[in-house]
Amino acid sequence: MIAEIPENYVSEASLRIQFYRKFAQADQIEDLLDLNREMLDRFGNPPPGFIAFTEMHKIRCLAQSKEFISIESKGEKLMCRKKRSQSDPYLKIGNRFPRLTNREPLIKLEEIFNYIESYHLKA
């Protein structure tokens, strides 16, 4: 599955580019939810590729607010690199990377979002 604004969802190229720009500039999840509502109102029910696209942007916004500089999944491993770290720059449970339990892309993105959401910054 490709995370995108598909041509069969928003057929006009200039509109797609405009929405790509709006999503890239959004830095709060509330802004993304507003954009999602606008897309739903204008274009109807979104295809899976667009849902993945919006979920990835939600993860990006949340990760920035939790001071992560990168989020990557390799197989079942979730690798979250912290902005400030005294020792290990990666978030781990014990000495291991968190494990993702689902292989279905949209559920996996939801799992990543929920994991990052549960992370608490240390002062």
Regions found by a protein language model. Give the residues of each.
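Accessory helical-bundle/CTD segments and flexible terminal tails appended to RecA-like ATPase motors
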Residues: 1-123
